Amino acid sequence: MNAKRPVNLDLTKFHFPPMAILSIGHRISGFVLFLCMPLMFYLLHRATASAESFYHLHQLLLHNGWIKLAVWIMLSATLFHLFAGIRHLAMDLGFWESVPEGRISAYTVFVVSFIAIVLAGVWIW
């Protein structure tokens, strides 16, 4: 029997630093935005086609909870991606490159994103 068999690691035992979680979240939010692009373009087309189609879309957004949820998800992904992207650009410029500063900036992005996402939900509903 081979003594060097693969080991199945329990991924729940790993504790990732907040910088890694933020980076993964930035990639996931970018992917969500990519998947939502057809809906965003459709809504933009409907909103700019005519006054009647804008009014119809406005009424749909006011009364349909699923549409509100979809818009909130798109807006949430956009806000998180924006704040995490600003942090990544600042790090490319040489700011927050040490581990303690990176940890603080990651937590700051999480808090600011959470506040902005909650405010977006309040604004939509």
Swiss-Prot record:
The chain crosses the membrane at residues 23-48, 66-86, 105-125. The keyword Hydrolase does not apply. Its cofactor is heme. GO terms for cellular component: plasma membrane. The heme is bound between the two transmembrane subunits. InterPro entries: SQR/QFR_C/D (IPR034804), Succ_DH_cyt_bsu_CS (IPR018495), Succ_DH_cytb556 (IPR014314), SuccDH_FuR_B_TM-su (IPR000701). Residues 49-65 are periplasmic. One of its GO terms (molecular function) is electron transfer activity. Keywords: Cell inner membrane, Cell membrane, Electron transport, Heme, Iron, Membrane, Metal-binding, Transmembrane, Transmembrane helix, Transport, Tricarboxylic acid cycle. Pfam families: Sdh_cyt (PF01127). Heme binds at residue 81. Residues 1-22, 87-104 are cytoplasmic. Pathway: Carbohydrate metabolism; tricarboxylic acid cycle. Its main location: membrane. GO terms for biological process: tricarboxylic acid cycle. Membrane-anchoring subunit of succinate dehydrogenase (SDH). Part of an enzyme complex containing four subunits: a flavoprotein, an iron-sulfur protein, plus two membrane-anchoring proteins, SdhC and SdhD. The complex can form homotrimers. Belongs to the cytochrome b560 family. This is Succinate dehydrogenase cytochrome b556 subunit. It comes from Coxiella burnetii (strain RSA 493 / Nine Mile phase I). The gene is sdhC.
